[in-house]
Regions:
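DNA-binding patch around the recognition helix
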Residues: 2-23, 57-102
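Residue-level marker of alpha-helix boundaries and capping positions
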Residues: 20, 47-48
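Short amphipathic alpha-helical interface segments
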Residues: 24-38
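Charged/polar, solvent-exposed surface patches and flexible loops
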Residues: 31, 46, 95
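Aromatic side chains
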Residues: 32, 48, 80-83
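Short acidic, hydrophobic short linear motifs in intrinsically disordered regions
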Residues: 38-47
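Short, basic interhelical loop/turn and adjoining N-cap
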Residues: 50-55
């Protein structure tokens, strides 16, 4: 399978062409992170209908996307994780997606 890589000073961001096709949940979550810089499991369920956001985040991390996990509690004490895109990645990820789409 064809792949695309973008080298940066510290990391290589790489993806197989099929792994980030438009319309996949992985791509939808990545674009959500690019637009809003964060996502929670509840958001992913409500917006994209997926209950496995942690698995998609793990896959994105394995491609070199730097995502941090911020553990939080709501007003009722229920714990959840907010996934945050690390600053400075938006341009290189958009470049990768543009190359994949062409």
């Amino acid at each position: 399978m064809d792949s695309v890589s973008i080298n940066t000073k510290y990391r290589v961001l790489r993806a197989d062409v099929g792994s980030l096709q438009k319309g996949t949940i992985r791509r939808e979550i990545l674009e959500h992170l690019l637009d809003r810089c964060s996502i929670t499991s509840l958001e992913a369920l409500g917006v994209y209908g997926t209950q496995r956001v942690a698995a998609r985040i793990m896959e994105l991390r394995s491609m070199g996307v730097e995502i941090t996990s911020d553990r939080r509690s709501d007003s009722m004490g229920k714990r959840y994780v907010k996934y945050l895109l690390r600053p400075g990645q938006v341009r290189r990820i958009r470049t990768l997606l543009k190359r994949l789409d062409s």
